[in-house]
Amino acid sequence: MTMTKDYAKNIENALKSCLPSMDCREKKLIDAMAYSLEAGGKRVRPYLVFSFNSLCGGSEESATAFGCAVEMIHTYSLIHDDLPCMDNDDLRRGKPSNHKVFGEDIALLAGDALLTLAFETLTNEKTVKICGTSACCRGVSVLSKYAGATGMIGGQVIDLMSENTNAPIEVLREMDYKKTACLIKAACELGCISAGANDKQIKAASEFGECIGIAFQIQDDILDVTSSDEELGKPVGSDAENSKSTYVSLLGIEKCRELVDELTEKAVNALHGFDGDTKELEEFAYKLAKRNK
């Protein structure tokens, strides 16, 4: 699967269809959910779900709910990350952050609602009918593990606790693995699970996801010091302002670029665990490593 306009349109339509009706008393909440969920972005995680599903012989129909669920989790995390009690960022994807439009109270609840909607989407009658009970249950287990206290949320806690501490590289590695790589890793595994893949394929996809996930975060650190707010669609330089350690502050830009290249090659090598054509995923990994926004 390539990141074509048709693919992007299918993802956007699927996400919209998952949202509750806006004809209700809690319309402001639904508006806030839609505001962030439909704000665009790279859609890396659903793309990986669809790509690994296809690689394992699945169908777009079987991948849709899994792709939507992981993007809902990602979107809720961004809403919460931007709150004043967290990163206190006013800009996301080139638009005012959710709490700047709807208020902190509704933004908090919109994030909570997207979190719960993700698991409803994975386990509703339609998804179970398409993918089977076993795949849906395993999907819930994988997504909750990688998004929870020992995954994405745990990474955010380490991030908060690392402010003004000059955290060493070991802490940074753990934080970035949990905060960023875990959900990308989950997306790769979910794509395989939705297609009924075997454990060997899931393990290979997991390794690919972990490598590009960490590379993705290192590239983010590079862009945070080499790009502008307008180019990235979000504030840059906030890590330095909050005295947070980053790969760039600890290792320098050139070493970071070397690490991104090494991790990307390792990710591509992990794809050798599949019998199908992995060319598009390989190209995607290289493109992600060279992104400028």
Model-based region annotation:
Residues 6, 10, 19, 23-271, ...:
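Mg2+-dependent prenyl diphosphate-binding active-site environment of isoprenoid biosynthetic enzymes
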Residues 1-4:
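Double-stranded RNA-binding/processing signature
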